[in-house]
Every structure is written in C-alpha cells, then in structure tokens.
Amino acid sequence: VVFNSKTLAVTISAVAFPESLYMIGDEFGGWDWKSDGVVEMTPVSKQEGQFWNVRYFSAKKGFKYSPIRDWGKDFHGLKTNDGYAVDGGNCTVEADGFYMVHVDLKREMVHVEPARIYGMGDCFGGWDAGMEAALFKADGKVLKATLVGDGEIRMYAESSIANSDWWTRECIVLDGKIVYRGNGDDQKRVNCTKGQEVTLDLN
C-alpha cells in the first residue's frame, strides 16, 4: 500500500443493532402484526444484538422474525442457521415441544433447540449451572419444577450459542407472572419454600 502526501480521511461507522426483535407466525399472532400474540423477544442482557425466547411450538407451523412490528425487514435466517427447517420462506420445527430461540444479529446466527430452563440457587439445589435436578420438565404445554430447598426463585434459559453468563438470559416469577431480566438491573425476587411447585406457562 502506497500513501502520498495528501491527507487521507477515513470514516468508520459503527453498526447500530435494533433494540427490539419480534417473532410472528401461525401460532404467534396468526401473521397479523396487530395481534397481541406476536412475541416480543427478550434481549440477552448487555449483549448487543442478541435476543431470545422460549415458547411451545407445533411441528410444521411457520414463524419468522423482524426488528420492526411490520413487514419489510422480516427474515427467516442469517449467515449461520441451525435447529430448524425453512418451508416457503418461514421457519419450522420437526416436532411439537418447547424450543429456545436465540438470535445473534452481531454474529449473524439464528439458533433453535429444545428448551432447557434451569432453576438456580438454594431452592433448586445450588448455584452450579446446568444441574439436571434443577431442569424444568414439560407437562403438556407448561414447564414444572419442584423446589428442593428454601430461597429466592431464579431461573435461566440455556443456549448452545451463548457467549455470556447464565443471568443474561434470566427470568423470575413475580406476582404470579414470568418477568424477564432483559437489559434491566438485577431483579426483585420472591422467596419460596421447599416442596412448592413452580409452573411456567410460556405461551
């Protein structure tokens, strides 16, 4: 590379990632952006351009994503895509069940896998990530776990493409509702006792 004596001006523009990402489909709003059934995906905390959600999906039912709640910027995949098929321009899964969807716009990845939601903390048996005893189990279209001790309820969704700590995909139960951490601060939590059953209705 040869430079002459003239001044060379270089402008570097940062890529701006959207602050929101939505999922629409046969089961998520019926392809109507005005529907309350459209899913607003949860940001992975402090991870620019990353979003996640866990829902119950039926086999062969189409869905896709958009950074706006409208058509025009919708997509079914990025550079690296796995865990799902594409049919007629829409994503589909092969079997009914709960799935974790993790979209990383920065790394250009869309990853879908069977959902693994784990409890974390004393009421779930400890603070080690991925404990089999702390895994929520499907019961029809809800997920359930029984507390093995007293303590605060904390939960998180595992992801095979995660590049951040478990709490960046955390959720809790507060006032009978599932509350997602997203990009917010550490959450107010509820204390529960051994033997109580926690039921998550994610749809």
Predicted features and spans:
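Insoluble glucan recognition modules
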Residues: 1-203
